[in-house]
């Protein structure tokens, strides 16, 4: 019985969430890869004034005491999975989102700070 892509996809469609999670972990271990989306780190600005900027990078500098709430907000902002969002929060300081318009950046900063995080706009 030869395995082909259609058979593999059919098996994946029938698998439960727990089985799929185990599959992802096994693939990560077997091939030494990660399913996390890459997060680019912003380069330091060259003396630009914040008022003159029209887009900002949102940097999580610390998660604070309410880490679970911060992880939820990070997931909402980035669309990352739970594991990836937790790794991002645990690895602070990290850039959460890049190239955000000024108004949206302030809104997201307020949302993160309300959840208990320390945030800077770059």
UniProtKB/Swiss-Prot annotation:
Whether Ribosomal protein counts among this entry's keywords is: yes
Q: What does this protein do?
A: Forms part of the ribosomal stalk which helps the ribosome interact with GTP-bound translation factors. Is thus essential for accurate translation.
Q: Which CDD domains match?
A: Ribosomal_L7_L12
What's in the keyword line of the UniProt record? Ribonucleoprotein, Ribosomal protein
Its name, as the record gives it, is Large ribosomal subunit protein bL12
Q: GO MF terms on file?
A: mRNA binding; structural constituent of ribosome
Output the superkingdom of the source species: Bacteria
List the record's Gene Ontology CC terms alphabetically: cytosolic large ribosomal subunit
Q: How does it assemble?
A: Homodimer. Part of the ribosomal stalk of the 50S ribosomal subunit. Forms a multimeric L10(L12)X complex, where L10 forms an elongated spine to which 2 to 4 L12 dimers bind in a sequential fashion. Binds GTP-bound translation factors.
Instruction: Report the transmembrane regions from the record.
Output: none
Q: Tell me, what is an example of a GO biological process annotation in this record?
A: translation
Q: Quote the InterPro entries the UniProt record gives.
A: Ribosomal_bL12, Ribosomal_bL12_C, Ribosomal_bL12_C/ClpS-like, Ribosomal_bL12_oligo, Ribosomal_bL12_oligo_N_sf
The species is Streptococcus sanguinis (strain SK36)
Q: Which HAMAP family match?
A: Ribosomal_bL12
Query: What Pfam families does the record tag this protein with?
Result: Ribosomal_L12 (PF00542), Ribosomal_L12_N (PF16320)
Entry's family note: Belongs to the bacterial ribosomal protein bL12 family.
């Amino acid at each position: 019985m030869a395995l082909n892509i259609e058979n593999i996809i059919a098996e994946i469609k029938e698998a439960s969430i727990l089985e799929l999670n185990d599959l992802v972990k096994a693939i990560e271990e077997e091939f030494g890869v990660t399913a996390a989306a890459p997060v680019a780190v912003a380069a330091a600005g060259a003396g630009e004034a914040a008022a003159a900027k029209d887009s900002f990078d949102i940097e999580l500098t610390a998660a604070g005491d309410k880490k679970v709430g911060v992880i939820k907000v990070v997931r909402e902002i980035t669309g990352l999975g739970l594991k990836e969002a937790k790794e991002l929060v645990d690895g602070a300081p990290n850039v959460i989102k890049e190239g955000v318009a000024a108004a949206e950046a302030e809104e997201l900063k307020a949302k993160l700070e309300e959840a208990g995080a320390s945030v800077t706009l770059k």
